[in-house]
A protein has these predicted regions:
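Conserved glycine-rich cofactor-binding loop
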Residues: 21-22
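Conserved NAD(P)H cofactor-binding loop of Rossmann-fold oxidoreductase domains
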Residues: 90-95
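Substrate-binding pocket helix/loop in short-chain dehydrogenase/reductase
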Residues: 98-99, 106-108
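Active-site helix of classical SDR
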Residues: 122, 158
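Alpha-helical segment proximal to the catalytic Tyr-Lys
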Residues: 127, 171-175
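Residue(s) in the substrate-gating loop at a strand-loop-helix junction
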Residues: 142
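C-terminal helical subdomain
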Residues: 175, 182, 200-219
Length: 219
């Protein structure tokens, strides 16, 4: 059951979300949009369903690790809207290779999206939140940040990094009334990424990502 929160709390809230074209990012975007928030979506693929369904959704096509383009997008948004109230980093990728088969390029690809991409969004948006003395940053973590997984050296390292980044940024931002949290989906969630990770047995119990959207709304 999805917990209902007062829609007035979210009306005209300005929310910046990465990875909005599918999975958790898409579901969380929809949850905010349904409650009247203005959502700025970032992804390198455009799922037009949100554009067609909600007038309060603004999509930007960009790879999260592209600092130059991300910087231009954030500057454009801040110039127009004056503030971003919530930052949610959902963009991520996963792949499996043994240490012998993990090339430097493979390592960089995982780290660049999952960790560097999260850092870039935080670097570009956190300063404006600190200046405005309010804000919420939510970074999507993983069980891989708690436990090592077979053939997941790059992915686990990227998610351990997200945890460390988030804890350090929390210490930096808390005196400015800016909150930094991570969310670790514990239940198997049905996403394009999880098709690679879950066995047929786990897929029998996996859940729609929309069901975890209240966790983001509460933060």
């Amino acid at each position: 059951m999805v917990v209902e929160l007062q829609h007035s709390t979210f009306k005209n809230l300005k929310v910046f979300i990465t990875g909005t074209s599918s999975g958790i990012g898409h579901a969380v975007s929809k949850a905010y949009l349904e409650r009247g928030s203005i959502v700025y979506g970032i992804d390198n693929k455009n799922n037009k369903s949100l554009n067609l369904q909600f007038k309060n959704f603004e999509f930007h096509n960009c790879n999260v690790q592209n600092y130059k383009k991300m910087s231009l997008i954030v500057k454009k948004i801040l110039k127009k809207s004056k503030s971003i109230d919530v930052l949610i980093n959902c963009a991520g990728i996963i792949d499996f290779k043994s240490i012998e088969k993990s090339t430097i390029d493979f390592w960089k690809k995982i780290i660049d999206v999952n960790l560097t991409g999260t850092f870039i969004s935080c670097k570009l948006i956190a300063p404006s939140m600190k200046k405005n003395k309010k804000g919420s940053i939510i970074n999507v973590s993983s069980r891989a940040a708690k436990f090592g997984g077979l053939d997941e050296t790059a992915y686990c390292a990227s998610k351990f990094g997200v945890e460390g980044l988030s804890r350090s940024l929390y210490e930096e931002c808390k005196k400015y009334n800016v909150f930094v949290n991570t969310i670790t989906p514990g239940t198997p969630i049905k996403t394009s990424m999880s098709k690679k990770t879950y066995s047929d047995e786990k897929r029998k119990i996996w859940k729609d990502p929309y069901l975890i959207s209240p966790a983001f709304l509460h933060l």
